């Protein structure tokens, strides 16, 4: 039975082994690259696939239309998901005639969502299990095919329960996979009235709140014990981790968080007391409780606290949806450079923000905005400033996938805008220079230029029109319901991390990244319709500084404003951009690793983008509003931007196979 598998972690490995043992023919396996900030104690699906001679892939977005098409070409009869961390789109699920099945680590419908292993321990459950269920569009909601119950012992911690669940999963799959193969299964619909759902946990969620009962704190310790990050507390500003604990029914009038004794190390709680059996001060070594007390300088009567003693004033909470994108990751870097921002981010990947994942003021959830609506609504309510940066913004997609562009760029963002209205939150919305369309003004002005687009049978305008309509909706909400907003319009921002070379390989990237790929691979640089179209290229650092000032909003000068962010002095045609890039490439110290330049080739836009494409001959911003509202002007010359962007991408290329 031809099978496509989505898998990660130990459960992914055992699921693959079970399929092979049951005689399934695995055509391809999709997995994830390991997160360098995560302690990898589990088996490698990629290594197992390689050892078994099975093609394995780890795309950033498996739901991209090109991956959907590649999976369709495999003609899977059935699909399995074993602890794959991304939701799989309905288009993929519908490819398999026998259906798609997911292995989930709880007794569904209880504990849908993320980290059920940890949540059942946090909540003090005495039973959990594994469930194999049919996959539907909504996460973990499909009919149940099989379940096995697993008892949770009082001394179970996360790793021991993980091993129990793996053992149960092997049994479950051994019993169930033959029945699926022969179409002989009985499915039971989940009872929605019994469903519970839990979100992703982060290390910051595991602080010990001493006013809670000792049993609750002990469960927290069990849930995140090694190899998870551990429960923690503070002595003054000194952080320490509790690796194991015991509950004492100690009757004491001491304030919660007070040290009752140091040998054993006993801490008063809201109800009872918690003995810290083993722990660790800062980044030190693990030690027994009494030695930990000595290391931390604790004596009877000392007080512990859940937060550092000298906590600064509350940071401004900024929600960035699409935080892993070009603007999102650079903006995150700028905000975290200051000491008064807390950044909350959501995206379907994390490669560009991996450098922030361990930052104490950066909180990331991997997910899709079309699915994580409850998480988004909660964080809109929780945060002070919202930046919905998620969009399909590459021209080839406007003609290739116009409906997907509309659904994501318009419909999903409209929902977020309405959350901002509902909870009265400030929104900073990314409009686009594309809204000006075929405007003939010498300088495109936010307040006076007409927004001119082509006919309906030219789908390339669906992005421009979607953004324009959202601009108008936001403006109306500001006028009629008091929404605090700023619209910003980027003009051809470029710099390191603008798309990636893999995106360029499938045509889904902006101009400079595509040109760099041509140089790297020794293929001709394609000049669409001769490359005479002119753009004003803006360095990402200039753009981000302007965006940062919008967030700062000195004197509330940005409220209700539309602000172009571009560099009118950096105007060049695409052909000129290609020539400047080539000159920089020829001088680069890594030049000898790459093939000879293959020349320029003029191609028609219809052959490259499709028949529904129209181009814009020029696009130059007026930056009058940026001067007035932000006291900002761009400073970085285009050549410097080209040099740094090229250098970044060349240093990401694996040079082992390149000629020298």
Curated annotation (Swiss-Prot):
The active site is at 104 (proton donor), 434 (proton acceptor), 619 (proton donor). Pathway: Nucleotide-sugar biosynthesis; UDP-4-deoxy-4-formamido-beta-L-arabinose biosynthesis; UDP-4-deoxy-4-formamido-beta-L-arabinose from UDP-alpha-D-glucuronate: step 1/3; Nucleotide-sugar biosynthesis; UDP-4-deoxy-4-formamido-beta-L-arabinose biosynthesis; UDP-4-deoxy-4-formamido-beta-L-arabinose from UDP-alpha-D-glucuronate: step 3/3; Bacterial outer membrane biogenesis; lipopolysaccharide biosynthesis. Its EC number is 2.1.2.13, 1.1.1.305. Residues 1-304 are annotated as: Formyltransferase ArnAFT. GO terms for cellular component: membrane. The keyword Oxidoreductase applies. The keyword NAD applies. Bifunctional enzyme that catalyzes the oxidative decarboxylation of UDP-glucuronic acid (UDP-GlcUA) to UDP-4-keto-arabinose (UDP-Ara4O) and the addition of a formyl group to UDP-4-amino-4-deoxy-L-arabinose (UDP-L-Ara4N) to form UDP-L-4-formamido-arabinose (UDP-L-Ara4FN). The modified arabinose is attached to lipid A and is required for resistance to polymyxin and cationic antimicrobial peptides. This is Bifunctional polymyxin resistance protein ArnA.
């Amino acid at each position: 039975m031809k099978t496509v598998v989505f898998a990660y972690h130990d459960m992914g490995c055992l699921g693959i082994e079970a399929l092979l043992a049951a005689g399934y023919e695995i055509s391809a396996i999709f997995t994830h690259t390991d997160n360098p900030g995560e302690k990898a104690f589990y088996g490698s699906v990629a290594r197992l696939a390689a050892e078994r001679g099975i093609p394995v892939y780890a795309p950033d977005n498996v739901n991209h239309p090109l991956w959907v098409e590649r999976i369709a070409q495999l003609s899977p009869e059935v699909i399995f998901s074993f602890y794959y961390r991304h939701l799989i789109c309905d288009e993929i699920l519908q490819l398999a005639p026998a259906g798609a099945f997911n292995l989930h680590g709880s007794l569904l419908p209880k504990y849908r969502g993320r980290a059920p292993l940890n949540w059942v321990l946090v909540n003090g459950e005495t039973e959990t299990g594994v469930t194999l269920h049919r996959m539907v569009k909504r996460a973990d909601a499909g009919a149940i095919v099989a379940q096995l119950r697993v008892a949770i012992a009082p001394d179970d911690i996360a790793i021991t329960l993980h091993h129990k669940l793996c053992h149960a999963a092997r049994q479950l799959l051994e019993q169930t996979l033959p029945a699926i193969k022969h179409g002989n299964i009985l499915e039971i619909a989940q009872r929605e009235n019994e469903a519970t759902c839990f979100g992703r946990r982060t290390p910051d969620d595991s602080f010990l709140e001493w006013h809670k009962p000792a049993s609750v704190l002990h469960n927290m310790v069990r849930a995140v014990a090694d190899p998870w990050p551990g429960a923690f507390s503070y002595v003054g500003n000194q952080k320490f981790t509790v690796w194991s604990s015991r509950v004492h029914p100690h009757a004491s009038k001491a304030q919660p968080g007070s040290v009752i004794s140091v040998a054993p190390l006993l801490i008063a709680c809201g109800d009872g007391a918690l003995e810290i059996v083993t722990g660790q001060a800062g980044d030190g070594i693990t030690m027994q409780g009494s030695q930990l007390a000595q290391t931390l300088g604790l004596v009877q009567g000392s007080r512990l606290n859940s937060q550092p003693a000298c906590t600064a004033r509350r940071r401004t909470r900024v929600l960035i949806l699409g935080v892993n994108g070009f603007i999102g990751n650079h903006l995150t870097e700028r905000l975290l450079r200051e000491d008064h921002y807390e950044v909350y981010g959501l995206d379907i990947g994390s490669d560009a923000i991996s450098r922030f994942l361990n930052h104490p003021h950066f909180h990331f959830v991997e997910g899709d905005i079309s699915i994580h609506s409850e998480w988004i609504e909660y964080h809109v309510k929780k945060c002070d400033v919202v930046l919905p940066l998620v969009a399909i913004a590459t021209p080839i997609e406007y003609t290739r996938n116009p409906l997907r562009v509309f659904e994501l760029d318009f419909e999903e963002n409209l929902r977020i805008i309405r959350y901002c209205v509902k909870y009265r939150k400030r929104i900073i919305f990314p409009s686009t220079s594309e809204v000006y369309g075929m405007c003939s003004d010498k300088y495109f002005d936010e307040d006076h230029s007409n927004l001119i687009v082509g006919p309906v049978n030219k789908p390339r305008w669906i992005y421009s029109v979607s953004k324009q309509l959202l601009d108008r909706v936001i403006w109306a909400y500001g006028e009629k319901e008091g929404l605090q907003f700023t619209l910003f319009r980027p003009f051809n921002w470029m710099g390191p991390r603008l798309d990636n070379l893999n995106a360029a390989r499938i045509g889904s990237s902006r101009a400079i990244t595509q040109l760099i790929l041509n140089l790297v691979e020794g293929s001709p640089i394609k000049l669409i319709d001769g490359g005479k179209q002119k753009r004003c290229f803006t360095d990402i650092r200039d753009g981000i500084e302007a965006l940062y000032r919008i967030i700062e909003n000195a004197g509330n000068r940005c409220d209700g404003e539309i602000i172009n962010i571009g560099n009118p002095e950096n105007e060049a045609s695409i052909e000129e951009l290609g020539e400047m890039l080539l000159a920089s490439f020829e001088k680069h110290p890594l030049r000898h690793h790459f093939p000879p330049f293959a020349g320029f080739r003029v191609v028609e836009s219809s052959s490259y983008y499709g028949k529904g494409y129209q181009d814009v001959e020029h696009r130059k911003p007026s930056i009058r509003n940026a001067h007035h509202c932000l006291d900002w002007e761009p400073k970085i010359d285009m050549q410097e931007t080209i040099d740094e962007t090229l250098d970044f991408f060349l240093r990401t290329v694996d040079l082992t196979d390149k000629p020298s």
